[in-house]
Regions:
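An anion/pyrophosphate-binding glycine-rich loop and adjacent beta-alpha core
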Residues: 36, 210, 216-316, 384
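Core beta-strand elements of the Rossmann-like FAD/NAD(P) dinucleotide-binding domain
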Residues: 2-4, 172-182, 345-346
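Glycine-rich loop(s) and the adjacent beta-strand/alpha-helix scaffold that form part
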Residues: 182-235, 241, 371, 375
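Glycine- and aromatic-enriched mobile tails/lids
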Residues: 1-4, 13, 21, 27, ...
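A glycine-rich dinucleotide-binding beta-alpha-beta segment and adjacent secondary-structure elements
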Residues: 147-148, 153-168, 303-357
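Glycine-rich active-site loop/strand segments that organize a redox cofactor
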Residues: 49-80
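Short beta-strand to alpha-helix junction loop
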Residues: 74-85, 118-136, 147, 198-205, ...
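Conserved redox-cofactor binding core of oxidoreductases
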Residues: 94-174, 186, 230-234, 254
């Protein structure tokens, strides 16, 4: 048995930021299914939204709701927007290097669905810049232990209270984790379930499956975002390469097989995706074209160096020709149902990031709200855990010895003898849950 105060599953931006906002006198165990740099947070290209000033509040709020088809939780949206400046200040304090204008002011870009430029960025690798910086700050903390290539297999709970987890360690052995305070699920989305996805393949919705297994409430499981533009390939690949929405925000256009523009590129993602699929069907093609030559060359060079290089490796010169793009699964709006402090319906269990759903995105996420939402509500989870730890919201619970005894009593090694079967079962549980939500919604 591994003992800790707080157990965080996942080392993406939400898990890392949560850890940074927890007390330094708490022992924190973090695990990640792959290595610490293989989280989808690293893959976010476009940027992170921020409320530039109060005059932008109404339009930012409306843009978020419009993209979400007005099914968003309005309080969640308000919290996210109102907290954005605080989060950005934290990130800059940690050392995140956002782009600046020539006069030293923060530079903003625009993406689909936004009525104004309000997105901060670092070249076309904003997620990597943020997540790598947060990881470096976490690695400086003596109270945090990170175990790589360690997967959460199950939680240990009784009477709707979580006491620990079951993990598969790097050497393939099974162990248990018992925690004194709380557990945080920050284990990403479900892209690994799809043939074409921008996500890492190991992200298969383990947290969602565990929630289904233990009766933890879920929300909007069928709300799955398809990104309009990933680089087309006729060969099998680990994941689809994203062509950031900010490329279109800077002026790139979408073209049909006759090299004619066929849609407004700055509509919300689901609308642009539908337009592309319709055009592909009309043209009888497996992709449409995206032309970056409408953007000044210096902007492309400075803002999108990673995209330029990846396209070059694939045989495309974005300066002289359009590139083929196709929609692919990208983001999971649904998840484990949480309140505005990221608490699930099970005691001692929190969920943040793409694993969680507080309704902030509605049916369809507005571009560059994902990193922000993950950070805002991860910090709120940490603050709630802090408050509970000092007794501000204390609920009578078993003492540490009793908690350990409960974990030992409930853990049955024979239940985890066939891990490959468990993994397959979990995948099917998530897919079945998606179908169930669709049926209940009449889709």
């Amino acid at each position: 048995m591994i003992e800790t105060d707080i157990f965080i599953v996942g080392t993406g931006c939400s898990g890392l930021y949560c850890a940074l906002n927890l007390p330094r006198d708490k022992q924190i165990l973090m695990i990640t299914k792959s290595d610490v740099r293989s989280s989808d947070s690293y893959l976010a290209q476009g940027g992170i939204c921020v409320l530039k000033d109060e005059s932008d509040y109404d339009s930012y709020f409306e843009d978020t709701l419009k993209a979400g088809h007005y099914e968003n939780n309005k309080e969640s949206v308000d919290i996210m927007i109102r907290t954005s400046q605080e989060v950005i200040s934290d990130l800059i304090g940690y050392g995140v290097d956002f782009e600046h204008t020539t006069d030293g002011e923060l530079a903003y870009t625009r993406e689909g669905g936004h009525s104004d430029k309000r997105i901060l960025f670092h070249e076309d690798e904003t997620g990597e810049e943020i997540t790598h910086t947060l990881l470096n700050r976490v690695l400086e903390l003596p109270n945090v232990t990170i175990l790589e290539r360690t997967a959460l297999i199950d939680i240990i709970e009784e009477n709707n209270t979580c006491y620990g987890g079951v993990i598969k360690k790097e050497d393939g052995t099974i162990d248990t984790v018992a925690f004194r305070d709380d557990m945080v699920l920050a284990c990403g989305g479900i892209g690994g379930l799809y043939k074409h996805s921008t996500n890492f393949r190991h992200l298969t919705g383990d947290g969602i499956a565990i929630a289904v297994k233990h009766g933890i409430e879920r929300q909007d499981i069928d709300y799955i975002q398809i990104h309009p533009t990933t680089l087309y390939s006729d060969k099998p690949q680990d994941r689809s390469f994203l062509i950031s929405e900010s490329v279109r925000g800077e002026g790139a256009v979408l073209l049909d097989k006759n090299m004619e523009r066929f849609t407004d590129e700055l509509q919300p993602r689901d609308v642009v995706t539908a337009a592309i699929r319709k055009q592909m069907k009309l043209d009888g093609t497996e992709f449409v074209w995206e032309d970056l030559r409408t953007i000044p060359k210096d902007v492309v060079e400075n803002h999108f160096p990673n995209i330029v290089e990846h396209c070059k490796q694939r045989g495309f010169d974005v300066y002289t020709e359009p590139i083929p793009v196709v929609p692919a699964q990208h983001y999971f709006m649904g998840g484990i149902k949480v309140d505005h402090n990221s608490a699930t319906t099970m005691n001692n269990l929190y969920a943040v990031g793409e694993t969680a759903c507080n309704g902030v995105h509605g049916v369809n996420r507005l571009a560059s709200n994902s990193l922000l939402e993950s950070l805002v509500f991860a910090k709120r989870a940490a603050h709630k855990i802090n408050a509970d730890a000092v007794g501000l919201n204390a609920v009578p619970e078993p003492n540490w010895g009793e908690r350990q005894a409960i974990v030992n009593k409930l853990f049955k090694p024979e239940d985890y003898a066939d891990l490959s079967q468990i993994e397959n079962d979990y995948r099917q549980m998530v897919l079945d849950e998606i179908d169930k939500f669709k049926e209940e919604r009449g889709k």
